[in-house]
């Protein structure tokens, strides 16, 4: 969900997931029920769950909360981020650039998630991190829309590079501004998609 592997409307069957992960259905069911409580999944009949469809209204509610919480996390992280964490972020930026060039959707989404979450973890505020991860679980499935309908010439990695450079220079306000611009830029793009695209039927 965090990386966007599962898309809005997609049905998840407990037995299938348990088989994929090589475990019994019971722990999978417990984990998925926690995600239902977080609002990241919706329960359905016949032991299946569904990734909620994203509506314009819901996205408009999530976006400003994300911008404020994730911006705060960057501001806190900038003062304490380690050299090892900066190196991890650098690797993410470089791999995202390669993924964009090769049009590798899953690779880009995976490193995009890692970049943001490693950065936010550096804030060392568990309460803030839990809130951010809860929001990411709700919007992650919608990230696929960047690649199914977007022109890959969009500024998909520029804000990450700007944030990294600011962190390396010790400029916390600039790092926060870069992440907030990243969220707002793509938030506006996705809101436009929601305005243009009719709801789709759930994937089987």
Q: What would you call each of these model-derived segments?
A:
Residues 36-42, 135-137, 151-154:
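Mobile beta-alpha loop/short-helix "lid" or hinge segments that flank ligand
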Residues 6, 33, 78, 120-124, ...:
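Amphipathic alpha-helical interaction elements
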Residues 172-204:
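C-terminal effector-binding regulatory domain of bacterial HTH transcription factors
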Residues 62, 83-144, 158-166, 174-185:
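Conserved amphipathic alpha-helical segments that form helical-bundle/coiled-coil interaction surfaces
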Residues 10, 43, 112, 155-157:
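Short, flexible turn/loop "capping" segments at secondary-structure junctions
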Residues 1-79, 84, 191-204:
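Short linear motifs at protein or domain termini
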Residues 5, 139-143, 147-150, 187-194, ...:
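Short amphipathic alpha-helical interaction/hinge segments
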């Amino acid at each position: 969900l965090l990386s966007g592997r599962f898309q809005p409307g997609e049905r998840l069957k407990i037995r299938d997931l348990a088989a994929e992960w090589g475990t019994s259905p019971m722990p999978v069911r417990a984990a998925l029920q926690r995600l239902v409580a977080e609002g990241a999944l919706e329960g359905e009949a016949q032991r299946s769950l569904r990734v909620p469809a994203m509506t314009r209204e819901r996205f408009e509610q999530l976006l400003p909360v994300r911008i404020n919480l994730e911006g705060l996390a960057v501001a806190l992280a900038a003062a304490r981020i380690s050299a090892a964490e900066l190196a991890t972020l650098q690797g993410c930026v470089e791999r995202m650039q390669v993924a964009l060039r090769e049009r590798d959707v899953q690779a880009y989404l995976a490193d995009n998630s890692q970049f943001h979450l490693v950065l936010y973890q550096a804030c060392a505020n568990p309460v803030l991190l839990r809130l951010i991860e809860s929001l990411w679980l709700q919007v992650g499935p919608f990230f696929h829309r960047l690649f199914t309908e977007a022109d890959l010439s969009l500024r998909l990695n520029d804000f990450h590079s700007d944030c990294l450079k600011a962190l390396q220079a010790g400029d916390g306000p600039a790092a926060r501004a870069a992440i907030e611009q990243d969220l707002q830029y793509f938030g506006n793009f996705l809101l436009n998609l929601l305005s243009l695209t009719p709801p789709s039927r759930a994937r089987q």
